[in-house]
Amino acid sequence: MVVIRLSRGGSKGRPFFNIVVSDKRVRRDGRFIERLGFYNPTAKENEESIRIAQDRLAYWKSVGAQASPTVLRLIKQAAAAAPKAAA
């Protein structure tokens, strides 16, 4: 089964997450199929905190990839922030 989930990066105390498509059996920070974007929970006000390639996300969902609950929350958060960025 293919899943869309977070892969942790960054250093101790400064987390940074890549939003990746991977096989469910592969470890969290292991091999992945494609990187769709990132989430930076410690971003400052002038830095971008979430970026998701919406076209690739739609493709992977169309072929049956399941998003984790946290990634679903981030997708909604990115969609809400997108109109503000365009203005």
UniProtKB/Swiss-Prot annotation:
Keywords: Ribonucleoprotein, Ribosomal protein. Pfam families: Ribosomal_S16. InterPro entries: Ribosomal_bS16, Ribosomal_bS16_dom_sf. It comes from the Bacteria. PANTHER family: 30S RIBOSOMAL PROTEIN S16, SMALL RIBOSOMAL SUBUNIT PROTEIN BS16M. GO terms for molecular function: structural constituent of ribosome. One of its GO terms (biological process) is translation. The keyword Ribosomal protein applies. One of its GO terms (cellular component) is cytoplasm. HAMAP family: Ribosomal_bS16 (MF_00385). It comes from Variovorax paradoxus (strain S110). Belongs to the bacterial ribosomal protein bS16 family. This is Small ribosomal subunit protein bS16.
